[in-house]
Amino acid sequence: MIKIGILGGEANGSNAIDIIRRIPSFRLVGFYDPDPLRRETLERACRLHSFSNPEMLTGVADAIDIAGPLSHYPSAFRQAIRESKHVFLHNPYTGKASVLRELLKLIGESRGVVQVSQPHRFNPAFLAAFPYVKTPGYMEFQRKIPFRQAGNSQSLVLQYLMHDIDLAMYLTRSNIRKSSVSGVRLVSARPDLVEARLEFENGCVANFMINRVGQEQSHTCHLYQTGMTIRIDLLRQKAEIQHLKNPGPGNVSGTRTSTEQLLVTPSDPLADEMMSFHTSIHNRQSPLVNLEDAFRALEISLDLQERLNWLSVN
């Protein structure tokens, strides 16, 4: 039985409580939130013990789920790492890349598992399509979020686009050679439509588009590689492959295509990644998504956000 505590009572924290309670091998020992009112409300609603400070919670738990931004709990994270506790991070954002580099060095001295939330990697549609991904030459990620759901105070790059960037880097396994970003403000002080482009050293190009002023919600990924295109619907958890066959010279009918619907078993990616965290702890193995992977995606996202900020004021 692994004793686990939660830092942060925001939406991620509330959801984490529900998920962890469904995993019998975890024993939820309590939570901490810096907001006294939210702490009291969540304690009553979830019938869960709340701690008065994060250090006390970290001290009694074997594992910590940091549901809020890492920048809110740096000391608790350092304590957990020094004591070789296991840590699950929902948001690795620390405000500064230098702080994250320091934390990366600390992790090297720890015997604990540190996993970063990347639910898209656990999406059943992505998992069904992944074995067919070889060497994509072009990738296209599109995401539409209803305005009321996204709000207008969040950074589209750091809140949403960063996860798609992680997927692209995971699929290519290549360093980024060049990047660009643009944005348009329609109804908010921040850009409501963002487009980004990454060019990798292996020749692959990834384009990203995110829009938070549409009425409909969608999240898709298209991969183009020799002989096929792969379409992944991350929202509806569907995936298909379009096989392309060149009929050869002299045939005027053009390229022949056939579509294959992949078998996808619907699941909850958030619950699956938490179960993966438990498995990594139990088997003493490296997590699927570690802090080094998250740092690379965060670093490029921060660079894109900085350039987007500059464009917004010029």
Question: Model-found features: residue ranges?
Answer:
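Mid-domain beta-loop-alpha active-site segment that forms a flexible
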Residues: 117-124, 147-178, 293-294
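N-terminal Rossmann-like dinucleotide-binding module
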Residues: 1-45, 310
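Contiguous beta-strand/loop segments that form the cofactor/metal-binding neighborhood of enzyme cores
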Residues: 162-238, 271-283
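A contiguous active-site-proximal alpha/beta segment in oxidoreductase catalytic domains
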Residues: 94-151
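Beta-strand-loop-alpha-helix segment that lines the small-molecule cofactor/substrate pocket
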Residues: 63-70, 74-118
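C-terminal helix-rich "cap/oligomerization" subdomain common to oxidoreductases
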Residues: 6, 56, 63-66, 201, ...
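Short acidic low-complexity segments
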Residues: 48-60
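C-terminal glycine/acidic-rich active-site capping loop/insertion
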Residues: 119, 227-292, 313-314
